[in-house]
Amino acid sequence: MTEPTASHNSGPDKARVIAIIPARGGSKGLPGKNLKMLGGMPLIAHSVVHAIESGVCDRVLVTTDNEEIRAAAEAAGAWTPFLREAELAQDLTPTEPVLKDALERAEALDGVSYDIVVFLQPTDIFREPEWIARAVDTLKTRPEIDCCFVANKTHKNFWVQEDDGSWTRVFDWMAIYGPRQTRKPLFREDTGIASALRSELIRAGRRTGDKAEIIQIDNTASGIDIHDAFDFHLAETALEWRKRNR
């Protein structure tokens, strides 16, 4: 179990950092997914290990409504001092109130205020601990930034359907077609892979801010977000490929 740092003085280097990993028991697309074994450990354990290995988190907290997930997370090194209330573990529960609840309960138990929150989604396992460390370091060294997260580069064209059924191309200031290398890339926000934000954003019910910094990646595997059996199969295949090619 991660233990809190004994003492903190003022200054950016002494900022208290807590990683929060939300993992509820209910899953319609892939029942029991957070406990399914993947690469030799339960799915939930991957994110716990990444947070610990980043070396920047004073606490690694898993918020769950499920005793089995709680036990698996604890075995991986997480802090799991409470079970999440049922009303915050429904199919349509947004992430923001879950993070706020976890932060407030952790602070009440620890008797401290955390300055930076690291948010990790357990269904996103293709991350590097270094990305977490970079996100936290950005907030510690750049006070003008309120959040830092991973974003995947893409050169694809995006469209949105309007209320009247018509279609509008997003970002029509870009050249519509042409060689991929000549087009300005877009970056898809992937906060669940790795993100760090000022705790006041969480207290305000937000998980991104207005003054962001992005960790740019171009990583196909990190786009795998495990929600159903096919996603899980892709993750298994990607892990095997990485194991053979590293």
Residue ranges of predicted features:
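Catalytic donor-sugar/metal-binding loop of nucleotide-sugar-dependent glycosyltransferases
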Residues: 203-224, 229-233, 237-246
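Short phosphate-binding loop-to-helix
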Residues: 67-116, 127, 133-137
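Short, high-confidence coil segments that cap the C-terminus of an alpha-helix
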Residues: 57, 112-114, 142-145
